[in-house]
């Protein structure tokens, strides 16, 4: 990566705390932590996937798994133990709220944040928040002090409506183009309010452009270039970019 001026920021690790013990999950995450530490990464991206449906083409996104109210306390406590385990090795655990998982909606994000402690950080994903019915600005306002990583993903409202009304899977939504980059006129996510709040709270982590799209339909170079330019312009306008990125 270095010859191309690139850095390895982090990587996804699937948690299975609903079906495995904390000790087993510590063992499972350790090789990933070793890689992150070797690469100089600061955050470890995690998400509970034991009952997730985002990778199942036969499952309608409308049928995302739901965690019973009396299960949140234990789940949150277990995540906090894994977060402490990561923190002891110099890595912040950042939890990715994600479509097709138990932490998808605004209420679920709030329940998760309420049931975890200070070691657990939030990966604020603007696209997954919007798609899940949450307001990215409201999440930023409420939780920025615990946000450790930001994914700047846009959503095409017309496609997200199709996913809901036609009972499509998450994967089919992605194939149809539900996600796109910052700056795309077809997108519905307002990024500037989130970036402004991040700047006001002294956020110094990464802003990651994410937008899984069919490369045969939408040119990756063109869209990534649009996303990067738009995000840089917005970061500068809102005061988040101090001129050193």
Predicted segments with their positions:
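Acidic (Asp/Glu)-rich catalytic clusters
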Residues: 1-11, 27-41, 80-88, 112-117, ...
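C-terminal helical cap(s) of enzyme catalytic domains, especially alpha/beta-barrels
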Residues: 218-243
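Conserved, mostly hydrophobic/aromatic
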Residues: 1, 36, 93, 125, ...
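The substrate-binding groove and active-site-proximal loops of carbohydrate-active enzymes
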Residues: 12-23, 69-72, 178-185
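Acidic/histidine-rich catalytic cores of soluble enzymes
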Residues: 11, 77-184, 188, 236-243
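Short acidic/histidine-rich active-site segments
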Residues: 208-212
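Short, solvent-exposed loop/turn segments at secondary-structure boundaries
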Residues: 20-25, 134-136, 218-222
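Active-site acidic/histidine proton-transfer and metal-coordination neighborhood
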Residues: 19-124
């Amino acid at each position: 990566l270095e010859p191309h001026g690139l850095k390895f920021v982090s990587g996804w690790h699937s948690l299975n705390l609903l079906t495995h013990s904390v000790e087993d999950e510590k063992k499972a995450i350790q090789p990933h932590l070793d890689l992150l530490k070797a690469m100089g990464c600061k955050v470890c991206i995690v998400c509970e996937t034991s009952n997730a449906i985002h990778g199942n083409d036969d499952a309608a996104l409308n049928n995302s798994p739901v965690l019973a109210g009396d299960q949140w306390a234990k789940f949150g406590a277990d995540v906090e133990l894994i977060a402490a385990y990561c923190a002891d090795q110099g890595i912040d655990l950042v939890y990715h709220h994600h479509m097709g998982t138990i932490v998808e909606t605004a209420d679920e994000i709030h329940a998760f944040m309420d049931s975890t402690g200070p070691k657990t950080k939030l990966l604020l994903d603007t696209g997954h928040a919007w798609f899940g019915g949450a307001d990215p600005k409201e999440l930023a306002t409420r939780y920025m002090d615990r946000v450790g990583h930001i994914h700047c993903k846009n959503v095409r409202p017309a496609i997200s409506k199709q996913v809901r009304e036609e009972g499509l899977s998450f994967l089919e939504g992605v194939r149809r183009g539900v996600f796109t980059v910052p700056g795309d006129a077809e997108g519905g996510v307002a990024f500037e309010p989130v970036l402004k709040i991040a700047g006001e709270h002294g956020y110094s982590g990464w802003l990651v452009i994410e937008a899984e799209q069919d490369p045969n339909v939408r040119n990756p170079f063109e869209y990534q270039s649009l996303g990067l330019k738009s995000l840089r312009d917005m970061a500068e306008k809102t005061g988040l970019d101090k001129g050193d990125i």
